[in-house]
Amino acid sequence: MSGKKRTASSSRWMQEHFDDHYVKLAQKRGFRSRAAFKIEEIQEKDKLIRPGMTVVDLGAAPGGWSQVAVKLAGDKGKVIACDILPMDPIVGVDFLQGDFREEKVLDALLTRVGDAKVDVVLSDMAPNMSGTGGVDQPRAMYLVELALDMCHQVLAPNGCFAVKVFQGEGFDEYMKAVKEAFKTVKTRKPDSSRPRSREVYLVATGYKL
């Protein structure tokens, strides 16, 4: 019994230490969230965003990914962000608050994109977790399916897509759908992603539909 308690305690300590490290690092670098390190690491490996690009950031609040994206896209680039939660303004980011699952919010987002094709779609969306896998997983998969639908509507030929997906029911089918739409798909687990989390990031390049 004591062994089990000790294991749980050690695991909890590791998690807290891990979180504390990235939270402190985010504060030091002026990032709004530790999630900024995830897109930084993906960018370092996959070079998704370049100066002058147009980027859509779904599930953007509190703004960690948008901070990184706007810096990479530069003055001639464009970052359009959306979240159901409010987000403090970021210079160079066009933010729309609303529920991406609603048609009117999607329409408003498409209006902001305009006629220009998008180079990169980012999605760090996740549902409010209930702790019940049978409820949470379908909700999470619905969001990533909407993000892929967004790619089909706005992404330029050879465009890129980075999306957070939770491993579980529906993951394999979703991976297949992404592979059908892009030339290359890689699975990333950034160092800043919590070790025990089921989240992974699919990084897809070369949009071909």
Curated annotation (Swiss-Prot):
Chief localization: cytoplasm
Positions bound to S-adenosyl-L-methionine: G63, W65, D83, D99, D124
Lineage top rank: taxon: Bacteria
Active site per the UniProt annotation: K164
Disulfide pairings: none
The entry's keywords: Cytoplasm, Methyltransferase, rRNA processing, S-adenosyl-L-methionine, Transferase
GO molecular function: rRNA (uridine-2'-O-)-methyltransferase activity
EC number(s) stated in the UniProt entry for this protein: 2.1.1.166
Gene3D superfamilies according to UniProt: Vaccinia Virus protein VP39
Catalytic activity line of the entry: uridine(2552) in 23S rRNA + S-adenosyl-L-methionine = 2'-O-methyluridine(2552) in 23S rRNA + S-adenosyl-L-homocysteine + H(+)
Compartment(s) where it occurs, according to its Swiss-Prot or TrEMBL record: Cytoplasm
InterPro entries registered for this protein in UniProt: RNA_methyltr_RlmE, RNA_MeTrfase_FtsJ_dom, rRNA-MeTfrase_E, SAM-dependent_MTases_sf
One Pfam family linked to the record: FtsJ
Family per record: Belongs to the class I-like SAM-binding methyltransferase superfamily. RNA methyltransferase RlmE family.
NCBIfam families noted in UniProt: PRK11188.1 (NF008390)
Physiological role: Specifically methylates the uridine in position 2552 of 23S rRNA at the 2'-O position of the ribose in the fully assembled 50S ribosomal subunit.
Protein name per UniProt: Ribosomal RNA large subunit methyltransferase E
Annotated organism of origin: Shewanella piezotolerans (strain WP3 / JCM 13877)
Gene: rlmE
